[in-house]
């Protein structure tokens, strides 16, 4: 599972454990449990069982024939993470972490959520494994994603609306971490992305790499060769890290992460921490952040609630610095256009997050030859976004 660039919780200069002493004990306990679990065939078998029987894996790698024909360039395949139980890639990681929580004897799980997809996945897993569940969500995100708030409550979770700061994902993470520190003995913090202090970025990636492992097997079966490009959206970066990781050493495969440019990267309304950020520390890790000269985190914005995080996973920061992956961005408008385009051209309504990856693909594919292959990670379905779309009144 390990690549040579990992060094005790760091990816080059990124990552680490910038946390108070009270949290270090819990992180050490977590790391030890995770390291034992991933070498235990019984744990791996149980994890794979639930991925298949409960979540419905493997997800298809679908040849988007209409999209390919309309754009007139490379062959486009869609990795259909939207077809997972709960409608996104988040469940891959949640099932792994909740199984780990059970193994560690924890009674309660807590989590943060932005778009609500991770919260729904945690509430789902907690219901299945009969564990108490509390989800922290920014007040602004609760408003934008009211459907997911209701889903979490139906599943038996308590949803706490966080009213501090910008009332979005960053503030939800802060509150969840604070509560975890207060209840470390019996509580497991289910981190939703490849962010936070070590071992979370590594652990979440290892639970998400199933996306890339399946993609590699599927594309070789369908095409007899690896793709030329893999494209995925990046907020914290777990769907992208999950599909990128098994291809990191396949140098012929170009890895492209797409951030949210919001109203434009030259405005103060975006969430492109790779394009416009600088290195700093947030939520226990060193990475690229959107911050001022004093190191204060600045407000971020995206039409997509799952991408408005002011940082990025440390492994992504490392892949950027070493030029193994390329990071770009698209605006709200481009993502909304792609959302409508895929819906009408393939009958697949993608999440607004995934629509960012799709928007960049729509720019790139026409410039490529018909022999080239592009895989786009459709990280989630767009049902959760119909409220947002309705407010924007785009489709009448």
Swiss-Prot record:
<protein>
    <recommendedName>
        <fullName>Tryptophan synthase beta chain</fullName>
        <ecNumber>4.2.1.20</ecNumber>
    </recommendedName>
</protein>
<keyword id="KW-0822">Tryptophan biosynthesis</keyword>
<dbReference type="GO" id="GO:0005737">
    <property type="term" value="C:cytoplasm"/>
</dbReference>
<dbReference type="InterPro" id="IPR001926">
    <property type="entry name" value="TrpB-like_PALP"/>
</dbReference>
<keyword id="KW-0057">Aromatic amino acid biosynthesis</keyword>
<dbReference type="InterPro" id="IPR036052">
    <property type="entry name" value="TrpB-like_PALP_sf"/>
</dbReference>
<keyword id="KW-0456">Lyase</keyword>
<comment type="subunit">
    <text>Tetramer of two alpha and two beta chains.</text>
</comment>
<dbReference type="InterPro" id="IPR006653">
    <property type="entry name" value="Trp_synth_b_CS"/>
</dbReference>
<keyword id="KW-0028">Amino-acid biosynthesis</keyword>
<keyword id="KW-0663">Pyridoxal phosphate</keyword>
<comment type="pathway">
    <text>Amino-acid biosynthesis; L-tryptophan biosynthesis; L-tryptophan from chorismate: step 5/5.</text>
</comment>
<dbReference type="Pfam" id="PF00291">
    <property type="entry name" value="PALP"/>
</dbReference>
<comment type="function">
    <text>The beta subunit is responsible for the synthesis of L-tryptophan from indole and L-serine.</text>
</comment>
<dbReference type="InterPro" id="IPR006654">
    <property type="entry name" value="Trp_synth_beta"/>
</dbReference>
<dbReference type="InterPro" id="IPR023026">
    <property type="entry name" value="Trp_synth_beta/beta-like"/>
</dbReference>
<feature type="modified residue" description="N6-(pyridoxal phosphate)lysine">
    <location>
        <position position="90"/>
    </location>
</feature>
<dbReference type="GO" id="GO:0004834">
    <property type="term" value="F:tryptophan synthase activity"/>
</dbReference>
<comment type="similarity">
    <text>Belongs to the TrpB family.</text>
</comment>
